[in-house]
């Protein structure tokens, strides 16, 4: 089994050449078409950045880490989205941007369901890291490549081999369909089906989450568990302190131990590959020592297009786990767009030496 410690440093040189793809040339006709002003119609009125929104309206920020929150707000900009950042080793919420969306019923997970399916398949010995599955007429992939490129056919096969009951068992074990937070009054639990979805069955459920609803809190909690070695914490803010206390009280609360540590190196390899040369490469920070691991999700539901990114950084001493959700009517809304938001957060925090800090930066006594 591949060791996860120091892995990012080793694979960086191997994958670096794949990170940079030369854009296809644009024809003169294409350039002329692009230069024409866009006609604003009802169909396109929700294109990102054409209609500015403030995702922070109504947010209560008393106990948010000010540095993390500022980085997340700046990175999200005017996109109709949400960011949840947590401390992986405690479950402490560091920032929630667009709390209305974060506390909502959630969205289809799209391909962010794939890490859960991968862990289930590894634990059930359906595959190993090196198992090659046929994903095209003459094309085969192993788990790392399938994670990097978010290959639906690969994960459809895993779901079909395991069946609905096994997929459901691991989905619920990892916290889907239940509250991720502790004492978060407005949080919704998302939804996890009691039977295979009518449309596509367990195959589509395993490739992009058909029939499932997840929240940013749930994916941030899951990313934190991947980062810390398999402890699923309740996400929570510090409790309000009593008069005379120096600071509010924070006590980590463990929901369950997942016992997935032996499988995490294989999972991390795929999530690193996604960042280095796959669908999550917009999250890569070339100037940082912390190599983020992540997984994108791109699909649509009845309401809008959906772009997800779950991620964590600094494996040796994990300090940050992220879930980014962006929604909108434009087909530009995709997982790589959410990965770009995470990348800007990582870069901003690195510029402020956040990852060099040994403790959270929030002054809990003042709440600022």
Model-derived features: positions:
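A short, polar/charged loop-to-alpha-helix boundary motif
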Residues: 103-115
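Bacterial N-terminal signal peptides that target proteins for export
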Residues: 2-12
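Short amphipathic alpha-helical signal-transduction/dimerization elements
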Residues: 227, 275, 343-350, 354
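Beta-lactam-recognizing serine transpeptidase/beta-lactamase-like catalytic domain environment
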Residues: 52-55, 59-60, 71, 79-96, ...
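Bacterial N-terminal signal peptides
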Residues: 11-22
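Extracytoplasmic/periplasmic proteins that interact with beta-lactams or build/remodel peptidoglycan
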Residues: 2, 26-82, 247, 251-254, ...
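Short, charged, low-complexity patches
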Residues: 219, 334-346
């Amino acid at each position: 089994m591949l060791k996860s410690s120091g892995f990012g440093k080793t694979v960086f040189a191997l994958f670096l050449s794949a990170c940079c793809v030369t854009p296809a040339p644009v024809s003169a006709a294409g350039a002329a078409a692009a230069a024409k002003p866009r006609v604003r119609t009802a169909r396109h009125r929700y294109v990102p950045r054409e209609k500015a929104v403030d995702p922070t309206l109504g947010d209560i920020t008393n106990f948010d880490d000010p540095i993390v929150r500022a980085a997340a707000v700046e990175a999200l900009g005017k996109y109709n989205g949400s960011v949840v950042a947590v401390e992986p080793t405690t479950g402490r919420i560091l920032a929630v941007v667009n709390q209305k969306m974060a506390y909502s019923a959630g969205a289809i997970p799209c391909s962010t369901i794939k890490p859960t399916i991968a862990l289930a398949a590894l634990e059930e010995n359906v595959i190993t890291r090196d198992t090659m599955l046929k994903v095209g007429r003459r094309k085969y992939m192993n788990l790392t490549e399938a994670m990097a490129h978010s290959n639906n056919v690969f994960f459809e096969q895993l779901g079909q081999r395991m069946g609905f009951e096994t997929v459901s068992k691991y989905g619920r074990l990892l916290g889907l369909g239940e509250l991720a937070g502790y004492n978060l009054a407005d949080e919704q639990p998302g939804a996890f089906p009691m039977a295979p979805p009518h449309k596509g069955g367990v195959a589509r459920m395993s490739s992009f989450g058909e029939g499932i609803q997840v929240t940013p809190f749930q994916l941030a909690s899951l990313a934190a568990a991947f980062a810390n070695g398999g402890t699923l914490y309740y996400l929570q803010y510090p409790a309000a302190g009593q008069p005379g206390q120096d600071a509010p009280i924070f006590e980590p609360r463990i929901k369950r131990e997942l016992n997935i540590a032996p499988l995490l190196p294989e999972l991390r390899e795929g999530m690193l590959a996604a960042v280095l040369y796959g669908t999550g490469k917009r999250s890569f920070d070339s100037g940082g020592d912390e190599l983020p691991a992540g997984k994108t999700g791109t699909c649509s539901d009845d309401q809008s297009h959906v772009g997800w990114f779950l991620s964590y950084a600094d494996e040796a001493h994990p300090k940050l786990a992220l879930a980014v959700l962006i929604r909108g009517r434009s087909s530009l809304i995709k997982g790589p767009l959410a990965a770009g938001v995470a990348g800007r957060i990582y870069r901003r925090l690195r510029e402020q030496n956040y990852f060099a800090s040994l403790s959270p930066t929030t002054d809990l006594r003042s709440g600022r």
